[in-house]
């Protein structure tokens, strides 16, 4: 399928938050795709501002998810973790055979498998995605799972993506990310609690010096700031994702 933009294939983004915006920038910059998008916040008080942001990136804001997905080769679900199931259920009603549904939401493997069943009734191909490291300028590193995961990776990687199919079984990619997240978020939680306590007692510099002696390659002064800043920046979203994964 291709949209109105000549030979460019259309990509639809359902959800235009932090991750959706990253994907839009990458896909549009490649010059290979036109991008349409819908976000539930388009209907809110901040809707005009968000739609202007989309237009500024040369993405087309649409009045509904089904409108954004019309004629799209790939429909990317990038909503909040708590809305992922609803988005998949709705997509099962408007997607068509020949389309891909790429579920990049950070939810449990069980939720991804339920999403697959919801989309299957439409005849579209479901592919799960686990976004591992959206780091500019090196592309968005993504693990894929599903019977047509390899096909979708081959389609989108020329557009600057760093996608890798890890399994034909839906749930494996999400399981990798979920287990990795246990380590990453645990380390960050230890850093926040440890360094804030050290600062409270006025021994932060001595604690950092001691850590540098034990782990000399890690540069704990820089690591402390980095780990704490990640918690401050992403804490609310991560809390919602963790509730969704273990509910």
Per-range role (PLM):
Residues 1-70, 98:
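NAD(P)+-binding Rossmann beta1-loop-alpha1 motif at the extreme N-terminus of oxidoreductases
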Residues 11-13, 101, 126, 143:
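Short glycine-aspartate micro-motif
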Residues 27-28, 54-55, 119, 156, ...:
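A generic structural signal for well-ordered alpha-helical segments
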Residues 34, 60, 100, 125, ...:
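Conserved beta-strand segments of alpha/beta enzyme cores
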Residues 66-126:
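Rossmann-fold NAD(P) dinucleotide-binding segment
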Residues 107-185:
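Rossmann-fold dinucleotide-binding core
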Residues 176-247:
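Helical "substrate-binding/catalytic lid" subdomain
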């Amino acid at each position: 399928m291709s949209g109105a933009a000549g030979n460019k294939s259309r990509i639809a983004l359902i959800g235009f938050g932090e991750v959706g915006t990253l994907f839009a920038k990458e896909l549009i910059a490649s010059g290979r795709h036109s991008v349409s998008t819908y976000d539930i916040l388009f209907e809110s008080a901040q809707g005009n501002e968000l739609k202007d942001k989309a237009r500024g990136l040369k993405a087309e804001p649409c009045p509904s998810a089904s409108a954004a997905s019309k004629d799209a080769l790939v429909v990317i679900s990038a909503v909040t973790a708590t809305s992922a199931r609803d988005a998949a259920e709705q997509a099962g009603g408007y997607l068509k055979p020949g389309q891909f549904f790429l579920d990049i939401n950070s939810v449990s493997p069980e939720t991804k498998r339920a999403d697959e069943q919801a989309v299957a009734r439409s005849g579209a191909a479901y592919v799960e995605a686990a976004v591992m490291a959206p780091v500019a300028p090196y592309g968005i590193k993504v693990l894929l799972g599903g019977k047509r995961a390899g096909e979708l990776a081959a389609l989108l990687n020329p557009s600057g993506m760093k996608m890798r199919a890890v399994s034909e079984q839906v749930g494996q990619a999400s399981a990798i990310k979920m287990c990795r997240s246990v380590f990453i978020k645990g380390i960050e939680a230890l850093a926040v609690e440890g360094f804030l306590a050290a600062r409270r007692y006025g021994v932060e510099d001595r604690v950092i010096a001691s850590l540098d002696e034990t782990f000399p390659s890690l540069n704990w002064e820089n690591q402390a700031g980095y780990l704490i800043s990640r918690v401050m920046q992403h804490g609310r979203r991560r809390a919602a994702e963790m509730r969704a994964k273990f509910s």
